[in-house]
């Protein structure tokens, strides 16, 4: 599994750059979506990918197995959101982490990455806690953002951030 990030508004440009430099694939292959909306490459069934973007940050994970990623800008929201959006177990973790917005987004990005991993989207998994057994997840953090990846392969310890050389 590889996880890349960049400050950009174009996830397609980032994905095209990663495929070209990491896999020798150019141009960007045709994209399709499952009925649930998860993007994939019909011509590259052995390569799974997932994209997330938030306020000028884009994160992309690639793997030979299903994978999900999420990145979110940390911003205050309705005070009731954590209790509404998190499962009881996640809410207990939220309180243990300090019950602040960075703690919420650490847990929320993990949940969203899990939902993207499953390919089902958020609605069918609302109120559930991502499983711990047999799968891998890792959380990442930076100035003003939180992110997570979820999948069947061990994620890298850090995101590989691409600077302006690829644009």
Residue spans of the language-model regions?
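Core catalytic alpha/beta fold that binds nucleotide/phospho-ligands
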Residues: 1-167
